Regions:
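Extracytoplasmic gate region of multi-pass secondary transporters
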Residues: 38-42, 162-173, 242-296
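Hydrophobic core of transmembrane alpha-helices in multi-pass small-molecule transporters
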Residues: 110-130, 344-359
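C-terminal ends and interior cores of transmembrane alpha-helices
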Residues: 92-107, 328-341
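Cytosolic juxtamembrane N-terminal segment immediately preceding the first transmembrane helix
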Residues: 1-27, 31, 47
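Intracellular juxtamembrane helix-capping segments at the cytosolic ends
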Residues: 126-140, 357-372
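Central cavity-lining transmembrane alpha-helices of secondary-active solute carriers
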Residues: 58-78, 297-309, 388
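Multi-pass alpha-helical transporter architecture, strongest
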Residues: 216-223, 419-442
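Helix-to-loop junctions at the C-terminal end of transmembrane segments
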Residues: 70-83, 170, 306-319, 400
């Protein structure tokens, strides 16, 4: 009896989905890499092109704008064809976007890089819209949230690798001249340093493009499970009306927007936050940036460990209740980030990652409960909610560019936005818990 219970998470009707699960789970690590090699690039591009934090944050606008633009086209595509086809198209666009970094570097301008990011994340949108519900379908509905949490547990491993590569193969190898020094360069000196820095920046993207192509061909030639039902008829508007009438889905999309915004803000602007704190303690700017990225890696390790721990705890707790507890804890740590103007504020910012670990897949799993084959469109709505990562970081960057807010360092004050996000998440967790209690009683 116990053995059957252990096998059930990756089995359905006596069929094991272990190999497909492993292959699709590898994609979770791949988009984690893309996300977290990109977050530090806001600061890097700002320095390379001598721009403000707000202009640098356009990287996040392009990056998460691609998610938003392709979510429903991806859903229509996988409804017409299959999850596997969606995964393959996503990998193809991911690789193409990564390879576009080379012509962008040859142009030597900022905006071609934004186009490359946009195309890359159009691929990620296809990949996530396909992979998340694909994982949910590889077993029974009762174990779907646990299965997705397990798959999502490998996402931060890719994120850790992305952070490590960003720190050691991009940030540490950029020209060490600080922001003030770059501002005083002549035009010819600026161009020479910019060309060198861009050459450093593009190499990891070209390499990951080759890795993506390898995964593409492995999945292409592997037998994968088909969609639960073949339905080439697209009832787009009626399906959307149907799923958005469900409170748990409608509120889930709204909440996911704020969660992704909080995650990207915390992981992007830890560089600015840490740099300010460490320079205040006498560290040089380039050293402060690299050290801040080390704190970001610690945050991701904490995120990764917490994901596995919370996935286990989820076996014994109501998903909404655990989500609410983690959101309240995240809000408390964010309050510390705002109020503390020393290294303890940075410690609080690192601790926030432990609280965020379970949020994305838990919100995702709760929102898609009971949607059946409509989960293809439901997943698209949740992927569109990743737009929060495009909208909210530029707002935070604009606050940071103010330098001071009500006598407080603007970097600290800017974290009021993630705090608000955690309040929204806590409310969703609470309402989910109430709905679960209502079902038990009713």
């Amino acid at each position: 009896m116990e053995q059957k219970k252990k096998e059930s998470i990756l089995m359905k009707d006596g069929v094991s989905y272990l190999v497909p699960f492993i292959l699709i789970t590898s994609c979770f690590a791949l988009w984690g890499f893309a996300n977290d090699i990109t977050n530090p690039m806001v600061k890097a591009f700002s320095k390379i092109f001598r721009m403000s934090s707000t202009d640098g944050a356009l990287v996040q606008v392009a990056f998460y704008g691609g998610y938003f633009a392709m979510a429903f086209p991806a859903a229509i595509f996988i409804r017409r064809f299959s999850y596997k086809a969606g995964v393959l198209l996503g990998l193809g666009l991911y690789a193409f976007g990564a390879f576009l970094f080379y012509p962008a570097k040859m142009m030597g301008e900022y905006y071609p890089f934004l186009l490359a990011y946009f195309i890359l994340t159009c691929g990620l949108s296809f990949l996530e819209t396909s992979s998340n519900p694909y994982i949910l379908s590889m077993g029974t509905e009762e174990t779907a949230t646990r299965r997705l949490n397990l798959a999502q547990s490998f996402n931060p491993m890719g994120s850790l690798l992305g952070m490590y590569v960003a720190m050691n193969f991009i940030q540490a190898k950029l020209n060490p001249l600080d922001t003030t020094g770059r501002a005083n360069l002549s035009a010819s000196e600026f161009e020479a340093i910019k060309e060198y820095d861009l050459s450093v920046l593009i190499n990891p993207y070209l390499i990951i493009g080759l890795v993506i192509l390898t995964i593409f061909f492995v999945i292409l030639f592997t037998k994968m499970p088909k969609n639960s039902e073949k339905d080439n008829k697209i009832n787009f508007v009626p399906t959307l009306r149907h799923i958005f009438r469900m409170p748990h889905y409608r509120e889930g999309v709204f909440t996911q927007f704020f969660y992704v915004g909080a995650q990207i803000m915390c992981w992007t602007f830890i560089i600015q936050y840490g740099t300010r704190i460490l320079m205040q303690e006498g560290m040089a700017e380039i050293d402060a940036e690299v050290t801040s990225q080390k704190f970001n890696i610690v945050a991701m390790v904490l995120f990764c460990c917490s994901r596995f721990i919370c996935t286990f705890i989820l076996r014994f707790f109501n998903a909404g209740q655990l989500l609410m507890i983690l959101a309240i804890a995240g809000g408390c740590f964010t309050a510390g980030v705002i109020a503390l103007h020393n290294i303890w504020g940075l410690y609080c910012l690192v601790a926030v990652s432990a609280c965020m670990s379970l949020m994305f897949p838990t919100i995702y799993g709760i929102a898609l409960r009971g949607l059946g084959d409509d989960a293809k469109f439901g997943a698209a709505g949740l992927i569109m909610a990743i737009l929060g990562g495009s909208v909210l970081p530029p707002l935070q960057a604009s606050i940071i560019d103010m330098h001071t807010v009500f006598g407080m360092p603007s970097t600290n004050a800017s974290f009021i936005l993630p705090f608000i996000c955690f309040v929204v998440i806590a409310i969703y967790g609470y309402r989910t818990k109430l709905r679960s209690i209502g079902k038990l009683l009713g």
